[in-house]
Amino acid sequence: MAVVKPFKAVRPSRDKVALVSSKSYEAYTYAELGAKLDFNPFTFLHKEFKKNRIFIKEKTPSFYIYEISDLDDTYCGIIAATSVEDFKNGVIKKHEGTIKKREVLFENYLKTTGFNAEPVLLMYEDDENFDKVISIIKEARPEYEFSTTDKKLHRLWLVQNEQEINKIISFFNKEKSLYIADGHHRSASSALLAEDLKAENKNHKGTENYNYFMSYLIPESHLKISEFNRFIKDLNGHTVEEFLIELDTYFKIENRGSNLYKPSKKYHFSMYLDGEFYSLYLRKNNYTFNDALSKLDTEILYRTILQPILGIDDLNNNNRIGYTNDKLDILSLKTNVDNGLYKVSFGMLP
C-alpha cells in the first residue's frame, strides 16, 4: 500500500508562471545566468521571488496533474506528497546507491530553505482505469499552459475536487510498490530530515509535513530514462579473461574494438575494458523477470554483474563504483578508464 496525499503548494501565479519557471542553475552558463537575472525580474533564480508575491500558497490541499510535451513525446503524471515511511520500509523501491555526503548536503538544504523545490520522480505500473480518471480531470481548463525555449509545452491542472482526490488516494493505496526513477538523494535526504525533526519533536504524531516529500508520479509507459554510466575501479580479483568468462553466463558478448560504442536497445549494455569496447546482450532465458524493478537496465546490471561478479553489494557505501550522467558525451566511458581512474565502465541506453 503506497501513501500519497495532496498538499498546499507554493507556486507561481497563473499570469507569471512562464517567466518564473527555470531549469536548475547548474544547467546555465554564467552568461545565461547573468542575462536571466538582468532581464527577467520574475525568474525563479531571484531571491525576492516570494517576498514580491510572485508566488502564491494554495489555500486547500491539492494534487497537481503535470504534462510536458514536445514534437516527439508526451509525459503526464501527478505531483503529490509521498511518505518517508514508504521509502524506509521498501514500498518505494530504490535501484541506485547514494553517497552519504550528498544526502547530508541535501538535508541541510531542506533544513535551511524548508522547501521541496524539485520532486522525486516515481514510477507506477500502468493501469487503464486510472488513466481514464486522469483523462477526465484533464478535460478541464489547465491552470497553467505555457511553452519554454526548449520547445516544450507545459500544462498543469489543479485537483481539488474531493471525489477526484479520493480516487487518486485510493488507486495508490492499492499499489504494492512505487519505483524511484530519479531522485535517490532527494528522497534519502528527506528521510534523514524526518528522523532529525522527529527526534526534536516531543509531540511527534507522524502527520507532520516532514514525514512526506514531493514526488512526480508517472506510469511506466511514460518513463524515459537518460543514460547514467557506471565505472568500477577493479575486477574484484578476476583477470580480464576470467571476468569475460563470468559475463558469458548472462550475456552474449561481442568485441567492438577501440571506437566509441553505445548500446542500441533495452537489455543491451556497452562495456569498455582494457582499451576495447564490448556489447553485452542479455541472455533473457538466464535472467528472472519477476517485477517492474527487475526489468530496469540499472537493476539488471546490478543483479548480473555488479553484485555477483564484482562483489558490490551495497551501492550506497562502496567507493569502488562511480557514476556519471553524460547524456550527450559518451567519451567519459573511455577516458575515465584510459586515465587509470577506473578499470571498467558500463554504458546504458537512455
Q: Model-found features: residue ranges?
A:
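A cross-family signal for N-terminal binding/gating loops and helix N-caps
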Residues: 1-350
